[in-house]
Regions:
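Extended amphipathic alpha-helical segments with heptad-repeat/coiled-coil character used for oligomerization
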Residues: 1, 25-41
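Sequence/fold signature of self-assembling virion shell proteins
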Residues: 1-21, 46-154
Length: 154
């Protein structure tokens, strides 16, 4: 998609719909389980919110004044991944939307003995307490890449 598509509130719905229409049938079959989500960057989240604000319904007015608990497209929640500050200095896509089952994304923290782990312990006599600091390694992975539907800004 072009950069203008990701900032135009009217185009956001088309992007979400394209992701759904072009998704693997196994993704679509899991909608009833309630674990699907659109993982989006903040610019897409904001543009979709502006799209909803532009609708003339009473609910749109109430949500624009009272705030929204969360956004969803056809019952599938949009999750703002809030990666803008981290992606700015990388070669990765700055704006994207990912449709998948939440259970398809794995986050792990290595708490076992590993060269990257560090644990420091000390006693603070002023507060009369033991303190500790630990450093762990974290990683994430996708279980099944065929269970992803992905759009990004070029």
């Amino acid at each position: 998609y072009e950069a203008a598509d990701f900032t135009n509130p009217e185009k956001i719905v088309a992007i979400l719909d394209d992701l759904w229409q072009n998704a693997d049938e196994r993704i679509k079959d899991r909608k009833a389980e309630g674990q699907l989500a659109f993982f989006v960057t903040s610019d897409l989240y904001y543009a979709y919110e502006k799209y909803l604000d532009s609708k003339g319904a009473d609910a749109a007015y109430a949500e624009s004044t009272n705030g929204r608990q969360g956004l969803a497209y056809h019952g599938i929640p949009l999750v703002d991944v809030r990666l803008g500050a981290y992606l700015a200095d990388t070669s990765l896509h700055k704006s994207f939307c990912l449709l998948t089952d939440r259970r398809n994304l794995v986050l792990a923290v290595n708490t076992s003995d590993f060269p990257g782990n560090e644990v420091r312990m000390w006693y603070n006599p002023d507060l009369m307490e033991n303190r500790q600091r630990a450093v762990f390694m974290a990683g994430c992975d996708v279980i099944d890449e065929t269970m992803l539907s992905y759009a990004f800004r070029v």
